[in-house]
Structures are given as C-alpha cells and as structure tokens.
Amino acid sequence: MNNANVPRSFDGSLAKMVKGGLPLSGSEETFTNFVYGGERWGKRNNNCYGFAIDYFKASENRKLQPGELSKTLTPHDDLTDPKVLKERTIADLDTKTNGGYVASPCIKCKKNYYKVMAFVDKGKDYHWYRQMGDVLIESDGQKNINSLAKNIGVDKNQLNSPTNRPAKGEPILIKAAGLWSHKRGLSELTVLDASGKFIKDPRDANRTYGNINYSTYVGTFCVNKDFGKGKSFACN
C-alpha cells in the first residue's frame, strides 16, 4: 500500500478516519468559518448550495440556486423535488469539464474531488452538506483533548491545541477529521447538526430545524476542488 498521500497526524502517524465517518479523497479543504463569518461578506450572500460547490459571493443579497449556473432552472422548477434538484445540480457541474459526478456516500471521491450530499423537506426547502478535511474549531471550554477526540471519533494525536484543556474560544485543529459542514440561512458555517453533535455522516445527523425536517436523502456528488475557483466570488 502506498501511504504517500494518506493524511497524517501531528506525530507523523497515519491519521485515523473518524469513527462512523466516510472516507476522504485527500482533496478536501480545511474547515473554518472565517470566509463566511462576517455579516458583510458571507452570511447574507451565500447559502448551503454555494458553499457546497465552493462558489462564494462577496456582494449581492441573492443566493445561488441549483440550475442557475447551467441556465437550466425554470420558474416552475420545484427544487425540493429530489429528481429536479439532482438534475439541476448535475447540469451545473457539467458546465465545467470534469466538474463533478454522481457518487456513493461510502466510496471516496477520485483525487482532486470532494464529497457533498443533498437532502430535502418536500415542498419546503433543500439543504446541502460538504465534507471537509482538517477541521479548525473553537473550544467550548468544557472538554479536554482526550474527551474531545473520543467525542469526534479520532485519535488524540490528530488534535493540535494550546493546552490539554483549552479555554473557551481557543482554536483546536483536527487533522483529517472528515467532518461535514453546512450553512443554514444567515447563520455561520458549522460542523454540528441540529442536536449540536459533530456531523460524521449527514445521513445519521439530526436534520430537523423547527418545522423543517430535511428527511429525504437526494444524493451524493463528488465536486472538483477547482470547480468554484477562477471566479470573482470563488472561495480561494
């Protein structure tokens, strides 16, 4: 086995895939809410779909909808219909050569691709989740490194923290965590579900927010890591 491209922990050992998680391709971005953290830059202008395919708008109050990039979206489309949402997403990914493809949750994406998942509450809303690589979070001030590693499902040596018991707000970097992130409405990015638990697999996460329950799984896609780049509103 060639371990050259396998993620490693801070001590140089091979990083452990999060328990109950899904495999990484190695092309996932590091999670941080910095880009979307400001009222002016990210929260108001970007939605879960834009984040999923790495399209970032620094201006405008209009959020990107599936089918807009490919100009296949019509006024009569119901994007909470799984079939329609899937078709419009595929059309958008096809606007670029090797932009992305339909995938399986349990099979890692090809090199240079990362994984996203879509769910709907029929007649109400759709929602997207995106798998990340390393994850940078802020401590809640309640857990030490051992308990946090156990809670996430990774080895302790995959965590980098200022102390063994970081104070509230202190940064913690988790190597190759493979957690899933998402963005709801005007909120910040998060790797937590509706119950405040780390998202290891969106299919197992709590996806109920008030009267909206994203209970219907639509599909999994692998998106080219460069799909959203090269535009004025790309993440990087």
Language model regions located:
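Ubiquitin-like/PB1-type beta-grasp interaction modules and other compact soluble beta-rich domains
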Residues: 29, 37-50, 104, 110-119, ...
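Mature extracytoplasmic/luminal segments of secretory-pathway proteins
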Residues: 45, 103-106, 219, 232
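Cysteine-nucleophile protease catalytic domains, especially the papain-like/related folds used
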Residues: 2-99
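Intrinsic disorder/low-complexity detector
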Residues: 4-5, 13, 129, 195, ...
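Sequence contexts marking disulfide-bonded cysteines in secreted/extracellular proteins
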Residues: 1, 47-49, 53, 110, ...
